[in-house]
Amino acid sequence: MKDYQSIFFTNSFHYLRVPLTNHLSTKMKKIMLIFVLLWARWFPIIGQAVTTSPILPNSDQEITLIFDLTLAKDAKAKGLLGKTSDVYLWSGAGSTDTGDAFQFQPAGQTNFALPFEKGKMTSLGNDKWSIKLKPRDYYAVPANIPIKKLGVLLKSGDGKFQTEDFIIILYDNKLNVAFLQPKEKTFFADAGATISVLAVSSQKANLELTVNGVSVTTTVLKDSLKHTLNISTLSGASQTVKITATTATETATNEFIVTVKPTPTTAALPTGVKDGINYISDTKVTLVLFAPKKDFIYLIGDFNNWQSDNKSLMRRTPDGNRYWIDIEGLTKGTEYAFQYLVNGTLAVGDPYCEKILDPNNDRGISSTTYPNLKFLPDNVKSIASVLQTGQTNYPWKVTNFKRPAQDNLVIYEMHIRDFDKDGSYKNAIDRIAYFKNLGVNCIELMPISEFSNNDSWGYNPIYFLAPDKAYGTKDDLKKFIDLCHENGIAVVLDVVYNQADYEFPYVKMYWDGSQPSTDSPFFNQKATHPYSVFFDFNHESQATKDYVNRANEFWIKEYKVDGYRFDLAKGFTQKQSSDDGQFRLYDQGRIDILKDYYDKIRSYDKDAYVILELFSEDREEQTLTDMGMMVWANQNGDARNAVKGNGSDFSRFSYKPRGFKTPAAVGYMESHDEERIMFDALKTLNLSIALERSKAALAMFMTVPGPKMIWQFGELGYDVSIEQNGRTGRKPIRWEYFSDPERLKLYKVYSEIIKLKTSQEIFRTTDFIVDLAGVVKKMMLTNSTNKMISVANFDLAERSVASIFPSLGKWYDFFTGTELNVSDLTTKYTLKAGEFHIYTTTQLPKPEADLVPWKPLGTIIPLAVESEMEEGIKLYPNPSKDLIYVEIPAFAKGYIFLKINDVMGRLLSETEFKAGQKNYTIDIQRLPQGTYFLNAEQGEKRLVKKFVKL
């Protein structure tokens, strides 16, 4: 047969352009020209991202795979465009029609984040790539095992960019016949239209084309047949078109069905129904799909053998925006899979469904994680939704959970996949004592709604109301939330409303080749900001607002979640920006959008948390936190620098430098998105020192008033880079760390400081001072019954620190319980490198011994006081409201410096006076009320006098 091109699975239809490239040799150009001329014979039917030569490939012959990256739909494929090298095939072979297409993989194909040399692609120019392979040899499939299909994708060497998966069907060595035009097995056409038919066979044969059993044309000993087919004029009428190839010894057939586009009935929605699945009774449901600008929609599923006919044609509402249908005669408790067949060409699930079935990924979910998972029929090739009447409600044990106050939250950010061996809710349930002992009072789950594939961080959402089955059943999730509530732990969901991946029905339904169409009710054609990865929601669209509000209401009411973290909340805008400098500027439109969502959430649950990943300018965050929302406060870089002994500033762990009125900054040293502190520290420090310095960082971070967050396993000193196996790839699970004595001490220090924070009222005070910018960091908190100071030396050398304590009397070292009687506020204390302390004026229960190596403060170095400077010096009045007068001995010579410091040792003012004066006047009117120190200095001579500003 002729060297035709084969077209296989992809989700959209395009025309392929194959211009010659200047990068090819003259000989190669000639070969390509012949190839293109052969191709051009069937040019009108070409248009898929993957084609093959020959047209009907089999497993035992060499085939050429040709990729056109301009036609790939995965958003991550954009990173492959324009490349001339560093593109690789990642592929597999499957032995069954319905099983895993990656069942057999080539030797050496093990790490997606590394180049796979055997799969190195050849550039054809203009974003087209090719590779030649013989499937049976390439995938090392035994001769007695059939190869039914190939699963293929292209990726960059480091795996950061990739196409979606494509499926290539392989044929056996017998006579085969197929339609190249039309491509679809079933499709719709306008009444009275004509369509072109092109069939090819794997060898010369007698070919016959029939329509509804009636012969319309034949050829003799040819390998192709062309025909123009006249479509019926009857609405909804179907025609079965069949091609038969016959040789002296074999017969092969293939067919497609074309149906005349129907005209739907117009009818108003039944009272009380809403978009999605409406359960009317144990035997009846009403399905409603919001689908403006669509011509007709069929409901297909288990209940009608996946057939589109007049009975399954959905009614259209008078405004043309919705389609609906009643399904009756259902069996209580039975799961039914279904899809909407939109305009006769696109089958999608219900955007509001609570469960999906995915023919390409579900078989990769273990029966341990999700028992008795239903599978789709072999002929259903795309995601379907599930409905089930008469479901048994989960028996909640906790129905009136009292949430921790926002300013008292200690959040544990958690990724189910990388938390334990099976990556399931069941694993998390089994570890509840771990969370309880750690002391956290909130768990923030990285996205758990259905995302593309089974292995992901979850920021590629496709069905926003369906929990992803890769982690377990919906009741497993509910049990985990219920158990958290039993143990005083709130649960927050990380939700992704800035973008959706291609498999989201409302992306696919309004699609224009490689991007959302201009008439999409939900999506911008191009993202309005520089950080979008997939397809960008338009949050000014009412359709988007309605969908997001429904999703937020659903998770609160159905799963009793305690709130949300909005991923990339800065992206909730229609304001155009090309870089972060523009993107982060105050945006009233974004504020209005977020306020609307927040108000709706609080109408569903008056105490629900809303945390924003915003990172906009302070003025905007001030406005939103004034409304009651919280914002992420990333200090990862400073935390890593502090542990390593480099310059760092922890000041913005506090809400005060941000100008917030309330403690609404969720400070964190690590998150899913940041490099791990311990990995970075171990580049320059040994493990023992790095663990101790991590304790110091925790002490200075966690004791700042306001909500805090830690990333999973930071409490054990997790030291695997975020970039290992690709940024979002699976990471090794190190539960063995919990058995390591030194790492266990870090966990226990986390536990003690977290419990200190959540149990002591002093951490809710607004009366606190932070001095967190230097290598020695200090902080002081005060309330009516207690005072607390924390101090840490992040230098790599010993430091002497003055004015640690703000008041005289008894202070108690938290980790040793040792009492220190402070009798001189000017005392200097020596802190070793990495040493930290937490002191309180109220004695607290002492933690387990030896969690930290530091002895109580007490290595005292008295300040040098020269007798010549001391004689005759006076400071009055003391206390004072406005002015203080200082008398210095008349015989002092040179210059005298008078400095005022606060109780944290911070310099507030400095005045230089010429010696010889007897009296000096200092204005203190601008100082807040409190205790201060006047330092009189001349050369190496120094005298400190305490005074009080009224």
Annotate each PLM feature:
Residues M1-H23, F43, P862-Y876, S880-L950:
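C-terminal outer-membrane/trafficking sorting elements
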Residues G47-N58, L170-D190, E868-L875:
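Short, compositionally biased P/S/T/A/G/V-rich stretches that sit at domain boundaries
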Residues L81, S85-A143, L221, S281, ...:
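Aromatic-rich carbohydrate-binding modules that target alpha-glucans
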Residues P146-V152, A237-V241, T334-Y336, H837, ...:
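Exposed beta-strand face motif in extracellular beta-rich ectodomains
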Residues T259-I297, G349-D407:
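Basic K/R-rich, polyanion-interacting modules in nucleoproteins and related proteins
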Residues T265-A268, G272, G276, S449, ...:
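Active-site-proximal helices and loops of the catalytic beta/alpha 8
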Residues C353-D362, P371, Y394-G563, L568-Y586, ...:
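Substrate-binding/active-site clefts of carbohydrate-active enzymes
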Residues S823-I861, G930:
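C-terminal beta-strand-rich structural cap/linker in extracellular carbohydrate-active enzymes
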